């Protein structure tokens, strides 16, 4: 009888825990994805802050030339970064217990791998938590689908690209100038500006910003006034009201006359689907582009495409970009390579006696 009561009590304890985890009445929804999300994101954030402040220099290129990234080792907010794991480690899983000492782990850039892997797991769980909360509330799942775009982009630069290049040392550093360095080196080695998927991503981000500004300004400019001229239009509304706060017909009429009739949406669902889909699809394509360039399927190469009747090259912008790429590649890892890989890969002319 005692065992039966204990079992029933423990079952109810587990049941109460499950109810609390999945309750939509909590101020912040936890969910089963949150059970994994919270510790992983807390770990990634804590280690990032500590390492950004105090981590010793990291031998990123594996050539015994450590690079400083933390504030206590001479950096500021702009130049500071979490330096990627050493090329000597490559793609090996490198937790603290795999190193001979904590000093060795820090020297080889162990914190970068720890932060990145916990962060990716955490943001993936955040996406799952968005779906889970939508499901509990009877909503459709598109919020999580939209969030998949930045998750895919993060996975591309922190995981897929290092896998394709063979080392976590090629991942994006976790800092401002480190991000710019990653972008410059990526352009030098993969010609990303000439990749159509990157072009689609640029159109998605800039187009999304434009459409967001247009939509917000149109809505704000076509509010249905519920107040007199002597008080703010904002005073005529309450949060969560069922009635529409703006006149979409007026906004449609304005924009249709500003551009032309069919450039404007007169259906709210179509409009908001477009506003969500445009940047999301663009960022999906960018993530896909990074993931293909990770395996060296690079941007278009139009170098020396135009020649005159004598066979002399007439430079185009493609050749100017190529020269810039070579210059950037020369400066990258300057002590690890004697000259750019593009030049090193050219077959030497045969010398006959």
From Swiss-Prot:
Concerning Pfam families, the annotation shows: Photo_RC
- PTM sites of type Phosphothreonine: 2
Concerning PTM, the database record says: Tyr-161 forms a radical intermediate that is referred to as redox-active TyrZ, YZ or Y-Z. C-terminally processed by CTPA; processing is essential to allow assembly of the oxygen-evolving complex and thus photosynthetic growth.
Q: Which UniProt keywords apply?
A: Acetylation, Calcium, Chlorophyll, Chloroplast, Chromophore, Electron transport, Herbicide resistance, Iron, Magnesium, Manganese, Membrane, Metal-binding, Oxidoreductase, Phosphoprotein, Photosynthesis, Photosystem II, Plastid, Thylakoid, Transmembrane, Transmembrane helix, Transport
Regions that span the bilayer: 29-46, 118-133, 142-156, 197-218, 274-288
> For binding pheophytin a, which residues are annotated in this chain's numbering?
126
Q: Which GO cellular component terms are attached? A: chloroplast thylakoid membrane; photosystem II
- Marked site positions, Stabilizes free radical intermediate: 190
Q: Where in the cell is it found?
A: Plastid, Chloroplast thylakoid membrane
Q: Which residues carry this modification: N-acetylthreonine?
A: 2
Q: In which residues is chlorophyll a PD1 bound?
A: 198
Q: How does it sit in the membrane?
A: Multi-pass membrane protein
Gene Ontology biological process terms, A to Z: photosynthetic electron transport in photosystem II; response to herbicide
Propeptide segments, given as residue ranges:
345-353
Any one GO MF term held by the record is: oxidoreductase activity, acting on diphenols and related substances as donors, oxygen as acceptor
The record places the site described as Cleavage at 344-345
Q: Which residues bind Fe cation?
A: 215, 272
Q: Any idea what job this protein has?
A: Photosystem II (PSII) is a light-driven water:plastoquinone oxidoreductase that uses light energy to abstract electrons from H(2)O, generating O(2) and a proton gradient subsequently used for ATP formation. It consists of a core antenna complex that captures photons, and an electron transfer chain that converts photonic excitation into a charge separation. The D1/D2 (PsbA/PsbD) reaction center heterodimer binds P680, the primary electron donor of PSII as well as several subsequent electron acceptors.
Query: What does the subunit section of this Swiss-Prot or TrEMBL entry state?
Result: PSII is composed of 1 copy each of membrane proteins PsbA, PsbB, PsbC, PsbD, PsbE, PsbF, PsbH, PsbI, PsbJ, PsbK, PsbL, PsbM, PsbT, PsbX, PsbY, PsbZ, Psb30/Ycf12, at least 3 peripheral proteins of the oxygen-evolving complex and a large number of cofactors. It forms dimeric complexes.
What miscellaneous comment appears in this entry? 2 of the reaction center chlorophylls (ChlD1 and ChlD2) are entirely coordinated by water. Herbicides such as atrazine, BNT, diuron or ioxynil bind in the Q(B) binding site and block subsequent electron transfer.
Q: Which HAMAP family match?
A: PSII_PsbA_D1
What name is this protein filed under?
Photosystem II protein D1
Query: In which organism is this protein found?
Result: Angiopteris evecta (Mule's foot fern)
